Amino acid sequence: MLCLPVFITLLLLVSPSAALPVESELQRDLTQDSPKDFRIREPLLLSKMFDRSCCGSSNTGSCCGRYQRGS
């Protein structure tokens, strides 16, 4: 009677799945970037890229007055 619980315990300790970290589907989904997030951030990213190119080394762009204080 004692052999069965000992065998099950040893089997659980030796199994390959015991070495892998447990990661739920929810945790995996929360840590990955989704295409929806990129579509939300894309206009903001494009506006930042445009503002940086507008306020380049010449500082003659019309948007440069807004961003000179922040840089």
Curated annotation (Swiss-Prot):
Residues 20-52, 66-71 form a propeptide. Residues 1-19 form the signal peptide. It comes from the Eukaryota. GO terms for molecular function: toxin activity. Keywords: Amidation, Disulfide bond, Secreted, Signal, Toxin. It holds the Pfam family Chi-conotoxin. Expressed by the venom duct. It is found in: Secreted. The modification Cysteine amide is found at residue 64. Disulfide bonds join 54-63, 55-64. InterPro entries: T-conotoxin (IPR031565). Its main location: secreted. Belongs to the conotoxin T superfamily. The cysteine framework is V (CC-CC). This is Conotoxin ba5b.
